[in-house]
Amino acid sequence: MASNGVDEQIKLVEGPAGYVLEDVPHLSDYILDLPTYPNPLQSNAAYSVVRQYFVDEDDTVQEKIVVHKDSPRGTHFRRAGPRQKVYFKPSDVRACIVTCGGLCPGLNTVIREIVCGLHFMYGVTEVIGVDCGFRGFYSKNTVALTPKTVSDIHKRGGTILGTSRGGHDTSKIVDNIQDREINQVYIIGGDGTQKGANAIYKEIRRRGLKVAVAGIPKTIDNDIPVIDKSFGFDTAVEEAQRAINAAHVEATSVENGIGIVKLMGRYSGFIAMYATLASRDVDCCLIPESPFYLEGKGGLYEFIAKRLRENGHMVIVIAEGAGQDLVAESIEQQDASGNKLLKDVGLWMSLKIKEYFAKHNVMDITLKYIDPTYMIRAIPANASDNVYSTLLAQSAVHGAMAGYTGFVSGLVNGRHTYIPFNRITERQNKVVITDRMWARMLSSTNQPSFMNPPKGTTEFTD
């Protein structure tokens, strides 16, 4: 029997010394007298040697680990992992997986490990993949997924299920979940996708359905808050090195050579910052969070000329969302997911630098522009991201089988946790330019901060 309380997703449990647990919803919150079953892992020979494999219900993970001695204990999240009791009989489980939004290294690994985790750890045999994002739910496009069909997909880029932006119709999606008798839904996507997943969870709860909704957060830009990082990010940074290395070779092979590399980062410059730190060949890194200006004392043009006179070459890394206020009126258009369409700041920057140096007869330059954006996101995950994606997928499976719903699995301070949907969709994670990591990057490039444009120049307004 179902109870009311669709909006009761935020579950706060308070304890002594300022302890707060931001708990995730559970099927038992709105369905009474749910039966439980022994976890099949108890009889799984592979796990018989693992001591204390099951997670204690009281285990939580602290959100902030750097505190003062008198600070309150702060916010915690429920620790991820298998429980001794599960709320689904494996023979009754009919699970589905959907991928939405842009591509990202590791998508196929997550798909594979959800399928294999359900099958080998819990004995679930019915798993289907939903084709091409949310709209696949109501366009009748599905594919059967078995350990055999997904055995080597982690070696490929992209997603075997296809993906799309938009197409979210909550009522139609839940109607089809109900019609197909699906009782576990795994949704892989970014913040927009997880907002859609939250809407699906709420509608399922409103209808009183025994359906667990689990999210695996995905963004190559690493702009999802709370979690340590997104899967695919390490691969993206590693692959970005190839473009930066090529730009460095081009720049050093000619007199006054400039190499410009545009990397992904619509609103957050993490890929650009970490790729710059990893490369050590970059002279200037420009990201959306750090304003800059072009002309005048201390501007970008002056810095480029200075660096060329000193070294005879220069490499610039720019995130796709950097300097949009400097670009001629940005277009007021959005993609199907509601993301603002940006002008190509890398191409614009290349043209502006060429024009300035020619117009002012500063010096002859040779400029090469490299845009590896889609190459970076379309490759398979590296070893680190494959392991990370595996653990995220397995955590989601453990959570759904244990009856949790309306959550994403994520790494917080090195521990896998279950996080309420609202916590990862309420804001975007951004580079903090007053933080140590940005200072480390500045010390690597020795670039100016560009924070104080002189009078008479065009200022960047945040």
From Swiss-Prot:
Keyword set, alphabetical order: Acetylation, Allosteric enzyme, ATP-binding, Cytoplasm, Glycolysis, Kinase, Magnesium, Metal-binding, Nucleotide-binding, Phosphoprotein, Transferase
InterPro entries in alphabetical order: ATP_PFK (IPR022953), PFKA (IPR050929), Phosphofructokinase_dom (IPR000023), PKF_sf (IPR035966), PyroP-dep_PFK_TP0108 (IPR012004)
| This enzyme's EC code(s) | 2.7.1.11
Active site location: 221
**Site residues, Important for substrate specificity:** 192
UniProt entry tagged with the keyword Magnesium: yes
The cofactors required by this protein are: Mg(2+)
Q: Where in the cell is it found?
A: Cytoplasm
Pathway field: Carbohydrate degradation; glycolysis; D-glyceraldehyde 3-phosphate and glycerone phosphate from D-glucose: step 3/4
- Please write the reaction equations for the catalytic activity of this protein: beta-D-fructose 6-phosphate + ATP = beta-D-fructose 1,6-bisphosphate + ADP + H(+)
- Quote a single Gene Ontology cellular component term: cytosol
Positions of Mg(2+) binding: 191
**EC top class named in words:** transferase
The UniProt note on how this protein's activity is regulated states: Allosterically activated by AMP.
Q: Which Pfam families match?
A: PFK
- Name the positions where substrate binds: 219-221, 264-266, 320, 374-377
Q: In which tissues is it expressed?
A: Expressed in roots, leaves, stems and flowers.
| SUPFAM superfamilies xrefs | Phosphofructokinase (SSF53784)
Task: Provide the binding site for ATP.
Answer: 102, 165-166, 190-193
Tell me a Gene Ontology molecular-function term this record carries.
Answer: metal ion binding
Tell me which HAMAP family the record gives.
Answer: Phosphofructokinase_II_X (MF_01981)
Q: Can you state the subunit structure given in the record?
A: Homotetramer.
User: What does the sequence similarity comment in the record state about its family?
Assistant: Belongs to the phosphofructokinase type A (PFKA) family. PPi-dependent PFK group II subfamily. Atypical ATP-dependent clade 'X' sub-subfamily.
Q: What does this protein do?
A: Catalyzes the phosphorylation of D-fructose 6-phosphate to fructose 1,6-bisphosphate by ATP, the first committing step of glycolysis.
Q: What is this protein called?
A: ATP-dependent 6-phosphofructokinase 6
